[in-house]
Amino acid sequence: MVCTTLYTVCAILFILFIYILLFRKMFHLITDTLIVILILSNCVEWSQGQMFIDDIYYNGNVETIINSTDPFNVESLCIYFPNAIVGSQGPGKSDGHLNDGNYAQTIATLFETKGFPKGSIILKTYTQTSDFINSVEMTCSYNIVIIPDSPNDSESIEQIAEWILNVWRCDDMNLEIYTYEQIGINNLWAAFGSDCDISVCPLDTTSNGIGCSPASTETYEVVSNDTQLALINVVDNVRHRIQMNTAQCKLKNCIKGEARLNTALIRISTSSSFDNSLSPLNNGQTTRSFKINAKKWWTIFYTIIDYINTIVQAMTPRHRAIYPEGWMLRYA
């Protein structure tokens, strides 16, 4: 009887020993594993949240959530126009300029009659079209750029339209050290300055000139001269030597990204060969490019205000085109 009881006690002690040795350690192991998994999952969720925030963050005006029933319920509409059209103040002026000292307040108030919130209209002037490469950043919910159109400036206007309506990513070019090549149809060189006279010499695989002598700039082919802005296209995948006056012009190596869908261009024309299909009065086209045939700038702004719905419907608010990392108009 004593032996049986002793055997029973020994068996119980053995079972407790096994439990302490194995099961309790396993319980702690399982518990520790669950805690580690919980911590890691929270860290993963946090890192994904940070990535999402980084993706949508940019410097500039951050729009509110777009209300589908009220397309003008946005943070800002920026309108860019030449500062040369702001004339001297006084009644009876016939030059067609904005001669009213309160023109900005007048225009903003008229936009409010079309449903735009108070304070959402921002008027900005520029000196020359090359400013859009060098210094102007367009970060409003909607951006409208007004450019005077003339036959003498048709090439530069076409190129600035290409620049404004798309996203570009650019790097500075050091012409004293490097030769450059364009790697695809979306790779262009953007030149801007007071006088961009640029010539190039294409090179073969042995660095000899193709139709030119690299050592003689007089043999280079002229691709731009007497211009403040140029988007230069050369043959892809061919290295080039480039000659220009770096004191009067700057050059950037640029890659075109996607369309800047929150931006529209309005060209002001007085040409008799005006293309009426581009007029907002006829609903325009879906290319985010319009023309207004007028000489008086108050008439131009009245037309833009009255047909702003047509213009804005061709755009998309808060487009992905506004990125950090240089995907802004200044460097883009």
Swiss-Prot record:
InterPro entries: VP7, VP7_1, VP7_2. It comes from the Viruses. Keywords: Calcium, Capsid protein, Disulfide bond, Glycoprotein, Host endoplasmic reticulum, Host-virus interaction, Metal-binding, Outer capsid protein, Signal, T=13 icosahedral capsid protein, Virion. GO terms for cellular component: host cell endoplasmic reticulum lumen; T=13 icosahedral viral capsid; viral outer capsid. N-glycosylated. Intramolecular disulfide bonds. It is found in: Virion; Host endoplasmic reticulum lumen. Homotrimer; disulfide-linked. 2 Ca(2+) ions bound at each subunit interface in the trimer hold the trimer together. Interacts with the intermediate capsid protein VP6. Interacts with the outer capsid protein VP5*. This is Outer capsid glycoprotein VP7.
